[in-house]
Structure formats: structure tokens, C-alpha cells
């Protein structure tokens, strides 16, 4: 038996008990003997005092009213209905956010269609629209490679231009060393190459006297020292950048 059915059963028992009891006669009245025969037996067996019978009668009435009032508000089905109504907008919002994030386009439902539907926008939908607009602006700042099959994305247009030269084969940075015909697509590549002609090794190990043309070669070498720390290379770079 469920809790609600049990409450109905107890309330019914209380009402039946109330109906089987009779009111206590006032002082000086002569009630009918037949009508008071059953209550007198109950009073004799259970209480033995008419005052106790009246208290028991009032208690039963109070319990019955309380059970009937509680039975009007059953908290069994209400949470399920509310949870369904609250979860469905979140599911719709999540589907729209996935489309906006992956494709970078706005959701299929336009603001005009939402207004025509007659439903007022909830605070969650307004908050999500603000997050989606920020994500859209962030995606517009990205620079995607237009070459078919590449799909790489860069945060700066200069990085995209340098990368696109890999597909086109363009090398606008030639080496100016005599009799050197090499060309490069990036200026930093030309700088590193030019040091091979000059013999310049400006990256010195902070723990020994070795020098290197490239910073990555220096880092790889310095990690072999047991007392090495990355901050040592940063300090050496600042010293080279400062004027003598």
C-alpha cells in the first residue's frame, strides 16, 4: 500500500470512528437511552469519563482534518513535472551551443522566430546567447588556411601568410651572402641560416662556455646539466638583448 493510500485509509477510519460516537450531553439534559447505549459502553471500557470522551472526539476531528489537508497536496507527481519542464530548455540550449561552437554559425532559430512563438526568453537563454556571441567573435578572429585539405587555423594573419607559403612554394626572403642562392619563406629561417655564414653563436650556455646558433639547441644542451633551471636561459637572453 502506498503512502497516499495509507493516509486515505487512516482518514476514513477516523471519520468512521467519529460518526459512531455521540456528543456528550449537557448538564441537566435527559438524552435517549438507546442513542447513548453504545457511547456509554465505550466510555466505560475505554475512558470512564465523559470529559475524556470529548477530548478524544476533538483529537479525532483534528487528525482527520489534518490528514485530509495533507492529502490535497501530494508531493509525488509535482517534482517530476517541474523537473521535466526545467530540463527541456537546458537541452535545447545545449544543442544550440554545440552548433555554434563547432561550425561558428548562429543557431537555426532566429530571434524573430522566437518572438513569434510567444514565449518570453528565460534568463538562462539570455545568458547563453551572450556566451554564444562571445564565442562567435572569438571564432571570427581566427585565420583559417584556405588551401583545400589543410584546415589549419592561426590567431594572427602574419602566421597564416607564413604558413600559406608552404603550399604556394613562395620564398620571398633570399640570403644576401655572396654566392649563396638560398631563399626562405620566413624571415626567422633566413636569420638562422645567415648565422651559418657568419659563424655567430649568440646563445651561450649559462653553465659552461659552449655557444649555439639556435636557442632550441642551447636548451637541449643545457638540460644535460644537473644544475640547470629554465630561468637561467631567460636571464641570458635578457643580457644579450640589453645594449653594451
UniProtKB/Swiss-Prot annotation:
CDD domains: KLF9_N. A zinc finger (C2H2-type) spans 143-167, 173-197, 203-225. It comes from Rattus norvegicus (Rat). Belongs to the Sp1 C2H2-type zinc-finger protein family. The keyword Zinc-finger applies. It is found in: Nucleus. The lineage of its organism: Eukaryota, Metazoa, Chordata, Craniata, Vertebrata. InterPro entries: Znf_C2H2_sf, Znf_C2H2_type. GO terms for biological process: cellular response to cortisol stimulus; cellular response to endothelin; circadian rhythm; embryo implantation; negative regulation of keratinocyte proliferation; positive regulation of transcription by RNA polymerase II; progesterone receptor signaling pathway; regulation of DNA-templated transcription. Residues 134-143 have a biased composition (Basic residues). Residues 24-51, 79-143 are annotated as: Disordered. PROSITE patterns: ZINC_FINGER_C2H2_1, ZINC_FINGER_C2H2_2. Interacts with ZZEF1. Keywords: Biological rhythms, DNA-binding, Metal-binding, Nucleus, Phosphoprotein, Repeat, Transcription, Transcription regulation, Zinc, Zinc-finger. Transcription factor that binds to GC box promoter elements. Selectively activates mRNA synthesis from genes containing tandem repeats of GC boxes but represses genes with a single GC box. Acts as an epidermal circadian transcription factor regulating keratinocyte proliferation. GO terms for cellular component: nucleus. The modification Phosphoserine is found at residue 122. This is Krueppel-like factor 9. Residues 32-51 have a biased composition (Basic and acidic residues).
Amino acid at each position: 500500500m502506498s503512502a497516499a493510500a495509507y493516509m486515505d485509509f487512516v482518514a476514513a477510519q477516523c471519520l468512521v470512528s467519529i460518526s459512531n460516537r455521540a456528543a456528550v450531553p449537557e448538564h441537566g439534559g435527559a438524552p435517549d437511552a438507546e442513542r447513548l447505549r453504545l457511547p456509554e459502553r465505550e466510555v466505560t471500557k475505554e475512558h470512564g469519563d465523559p470529559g475524556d470522551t470529548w477530548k478524544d472526539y476533538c483529537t479525532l476531528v483534528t487528525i482527520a482534518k489534518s490528514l485530509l489537508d495533507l492529502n490535497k497536496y501530494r508531493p509525488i507527481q509535482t517534482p517530476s513535472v517541474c523537473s521535466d519542464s526545467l530540463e527541456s530548455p537546458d537541452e535545447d540550449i545545449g544543442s544550440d551551443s554545440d552548433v555554434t561552437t563547432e561550425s561558428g554559425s548562429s543557431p537555426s532559430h532566429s530571434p524573430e522566430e522566437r518572438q513569434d512563438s510567444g514565449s518570453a526568453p528565460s534568463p538562462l537563454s539570455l545568458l547563453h546567447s551572450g556566451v554564444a556571441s562571445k564565442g562567435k567573435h572569438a571564432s571570427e578572429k581566427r585565420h583559417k588556411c584556405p588551401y583545400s585539405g589543410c584546415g589549419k587555423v592561426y590567431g594572427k594573419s602574419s602566421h597564416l601568410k607564413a604558413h600559406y607559403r608552404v603550399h604556394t612554394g613562395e620564398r620571398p626572403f633570399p640570403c644576401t651572402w655572396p654566392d649563396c642562392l638560398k631563399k626562405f619563406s620566413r624571415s626567422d629561417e633566413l636569420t638562422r641560416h645567415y648565422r651559418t655564414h657568419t659563424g655567430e653563436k649568440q646563445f651561450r650556455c649559462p653553465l659552461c662556455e659552449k655557444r649555439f646558433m639556435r636557442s632550441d639547441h642551447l636548451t637541449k644542451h643545457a638540460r644535460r646539466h644537473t644544475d640547470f633551471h629554465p630561468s637561467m636561459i631567460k636571464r641570458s637572453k635578457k643580457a644579450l638583448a640589453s645594449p653594451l
